[in-house]
Amino acid sequence: MGTQPMTDRLNRPFRDLRISVTDRCNFRCHYCMPADIFGPDYPFLKKTEILSFEETNRLVHLFHQTSPIKKIRITGGEPLMRKDVDQLISMLTATTGIEDVAMTTNGTLLPKMADKLKKAGLKRVTVSLDSLEDEQFGKINGRGIGTKPVLDGMEAAKEAGLGVKVNMVVQKGVNDQDVLPMAQFFKEKGYTLRFIEYMDVGNSNGWRMDDVVAKRDILEMIHKVHPLEPVDPEYPGEVATRYRYKGTSVEIGVISSVTDAFCTTCNRARLSVEGKLYTCLFATKGHDFRELLRSGASDEEIQQKLAAIWHVRDDKYSLKRTSLTNKRKKVEMSHIGG
């Protein structure tokens, strides 16, 4: 394994890898998988089209040998809908030695999976919850599901020994009134809550700039009631700007891809469930590694392809975002993870 990470054209290292393990989800959140598009007849991927755990593990092992990966995040869709996903986590931690393996989930399946995930080597979960109001949350998730299954999932993860963070996508006129109640609730719980600016990911969510609640407005709302102080990032390229409630150890974070983009330090790649590598969340196309795997490519050929892709990477979509760039066809977030 090389001791130094590869860098791209903007001198950004390849440090983090997000792995989507399914394109399916039991929610239909309108900003990700709206029900009118992802309905009963939607053509989800067939089993033969998605990477097996063995194929995924081989790719990650080779990627890690090419450029040391510091963190893996398992995503979806809803990753816990992939049968035996804990087995993949066991394989990844055993084969690569990468210790920082996390998962983003809606939390509803954690009560029956948390112990297995912990034993497999998962370190923490980030659970998505956009409101504490059952009716409002049910509208957002498109399934009428209240908050209890998600909150129960968080508790199950905590009891299993997993770290827990919470993500909230904030949309003007939808759930911006919930910013303060969420902040208060999770401050008392002691969980880090991260507010995410509503982003133009994919092509299905009808994104408009007018629907974005800016980082500065989120912080102002909270700081007036719960004074905050800045916290230094844990590592270069950390996506969330971190703050701590004064007089406590409890933190919040803001992920501000729209109003305060972090493209210049982005060190992440995304491996989709069918084996395409994307070098940006807002990418229009991916690089096919499944075909390489299934055509008998050697380890060296796979590593060479990864290096060639990363060395010419120059993505900086969020720094160039306009009403015109928003119209270009992008891969859906449910396909490559957030």
Curated annotation (Swiss-Prot):
Gene3D superfamilies: Aldolase class I. Pathway: Cofactor biosynthesis; molybdopterin biosynthesis. It is an enzyme of class 4 (lyase). Its EC number is 4.1.99.22. S-adenosyl-L-methionine binds at residues 31, 77, 128, 199. Keywords: 4Fe-4S, GTP-binding, Iron, Iron-sulfur, Lyase, Metal-binding, Molybdenum cofactor biosynthesis, Nucleotide-binding, S-adenosyl-L-methionine. It catalyses: GTP + AH2 + S-adenosyl-L-methionine = (8S)-3',8-cyclo-7,8-dihydroguanosine 5'-triphosphate + 5'-deoxyadenosine + L-methionine + A + H(+). The keyword Metal-binding applies. [4Fe-4S] cluster 1 binds at residues 25, 29, 32. GTP binds at residues 18, 73, 104, 165, 268-270. Binds 2 [4Fe-4S] clusters. Binds 1 [4Fe-4S] cluster coordinated with 3 cysteines and an exchangeable S-adenosyl-L-methionine and 1 [4Fe-4S] cluster coordinated with 3 cysteines and the GTP-derived substrate. Its cofactor is [4Fe-4S] cluster. Belongs to the radical SAM superfamily. MoaA family. PANTHER family: MOLYBDENUM COFACTOR BIOSYNTHESIS PROTEIN 1, MOLYBDOPTERIN COFACTOR SYNTHESIS PROTEIN A. Catalyzes the cyclization of GTP to (8S)-3',8-cyclo-7,8-dihydroguanosine 5'-triphosphate. Monomer and homodimer. NCBIfam families: moaA. This is GTP 3',8-cyclase.
